[in-house]
């Protein structure tokens, strides 16, 4: 009888341990480097042309609360027929997903930032791959205590704002697939 009670008690302890600790023991999420961002998730973005120096144009893009960054940048590139651009930005994110490139898997390990953060730096470029504009961004996000996480930007939802300075160049830059790394990389000599 005492042994049966001990076995039942041990099962309950194991079960409760699995519930308590198993919630955080989920499988690591990975994403393919060539996965395009979803569009339609940035309805509040405002755009203004602030410089038109010949064929090079500079725009300011202001994101509203709730707008998703990669979606808004992709939509801008499509609407304005961007063939080559570079950008910088600062602002705030409510939450974000960044990626760290795992060479052994040839994929991005997803790092979730589930708390409000200062976007202390966002830089990137836009180039053409298979006829479509591809946004490539890297971001630094600072937590309340000043700790900074950075990596490849997968998604970031803005609150209260993001201020992007976007320079669009007239010469098309093209990307091609690097099969060794499973990445689409800019090739300045590639003409399409």
Which positions does each model-derived feature cover?
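N-terminal intrinsically disordered, cationic/polar leader segments
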Residues: 28-60, 64-67, 71-78, 84-88, ...
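Bacterial N-terminal signal peptides
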Residues: 11-22
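Sec/Tat signal peptide C-region and signal peptidase I cleavage site
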Residues: 23-27
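Bacterial N-terminal signal peptides that target proteins for export
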Residues: 2-13
């Amino acid at each position: 009888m005492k042994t049966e009670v001990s076995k039942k008690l041990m099962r309950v302890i194991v079960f409760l341990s699995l519930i308590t600790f198993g919630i955080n023991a989920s499988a690591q999420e990975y994403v393919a480097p060539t996965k395009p961002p979803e569009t339609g998730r940035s309805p509040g973005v405002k755009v203004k042309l602030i410089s038109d120096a010949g064929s090079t144009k500079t725009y300011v893009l202001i994101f509203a609360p709730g707008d998703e960054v990669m979606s808004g940048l992709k939509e801008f590139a499509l609407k304005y027929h961007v063939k080559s651009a570079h950008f910088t930005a600062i602002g705030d994110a409510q939450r974000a997903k960044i990626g760290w490139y795992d060479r052994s898997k040839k994929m991005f390990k997803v790092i979730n930032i589930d708390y409000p953060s200062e976007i202390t730096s966002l830089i990137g470029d836009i180039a053409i791959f298979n006829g479509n504009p591809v946004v490539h961004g890297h971001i630094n996000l600072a937590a309340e205590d000043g700790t900074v996480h950075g990596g490849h930007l997968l998604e970031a939802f803005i609150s209260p704002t993001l201020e992007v300075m976007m320079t669009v160049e007239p010469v098309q830059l093209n990307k091609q697939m690097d099969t060794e790394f499973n990445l689409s990389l800019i090739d300045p000599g590639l003409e399409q």
